[in-house]
Every structure is written in C-alpha cells, then in structure tokens.
C-alpha cells in the first residue's frame, strides 16, 4: 500500500465503514431470527408487529447500501410468506 496521505485516509475510512457495516449486518441477522422464532412459537400478533420493525431496519440498511436492495426485498418477502402460513 502506498504511504501517501490520501491512501492512509482511505484505509482509515474503509476500516470505520467495515466495523459499522458488520455491526448492522449482525443486528439484522439477530432480529430476523427473533421474528422467525416468534412465528414458529405461534405468537403471530407479536410477530406481525415485529415484522414491521424488521422491514424498516432492512429498508434502512438497503438505503445506506449496507445490503443490496434486492436482498432486503427477498428477506422481507420470505418473512412475509412465513407470517401468512
């Protein structure tokens, strides 16, 4: 890697972004699992309310380009299918 100032700055920025993105992705996985567990436990009313929260988080992550918009749409669709069963 070059030792000029701009390369060092980009390296610092990339590291900060990676840390932030990893934490958001981890949070998304956790809340998605919680929603699935609610559905499997038969708590549909709670799951429906929680699904709205999950969808909002997925849309936010897609808007900030942490995940791809199609991935967010796919995850919301699959959770919705589970809810409707």
Swiss-Prot record:
SUPFAM superfamilies xref list: Ribosomal protein S20 (SSF46992)
GO biological process, one term: translation
UniProt keywords, alphabetically: Ribonucleoprotein, Ribosomal protein, RNA-binding, rRNA-binding
One GO MF term: structural constituent of ribosome
Domain of life: Bacteria
InterPro entries: Ribosomal_bS20, Ribosomal_bS20_sf
Gene Ontology CC, one term: small ribosomal subunit
Gene3D superfamilies named in the record: Ribosomal protein S20
Record has rRNA-binding as a keyword: yes
HAMAP family given in the database record: Ribosomal_bS20 (MF_00500)
Function: Binds directly to 16S ribosomal RNA.
Similarity field: Belongs to the bacterial ribosomal protein bS20 family.
Listed name of the protein: Small ribosomal subunit protein bS20
Source taxonomy: Bacteria, Pseudomonadati, Spirochaetota, Spirochaetia, Spirochaetales
């Amino acid at each position: 890697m070059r030792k000029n100032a701009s390369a060092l700055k980009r390296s610092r920025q990339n590291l900060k972004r990676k840390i932030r993105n990893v934490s958001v992705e981890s949070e998304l996985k956790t809340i998605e699992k919680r929603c699935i567990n609610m559905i499997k436990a038969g708590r549909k009313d709670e799951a429906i309310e929680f699904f709205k929260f999950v969808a909002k988080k997925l849309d936010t992550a897609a808007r900030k380009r942490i995940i791809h918009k199609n991935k967010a749409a796919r995850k919301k669709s699959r959770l919705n299918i589970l809810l409707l069963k």
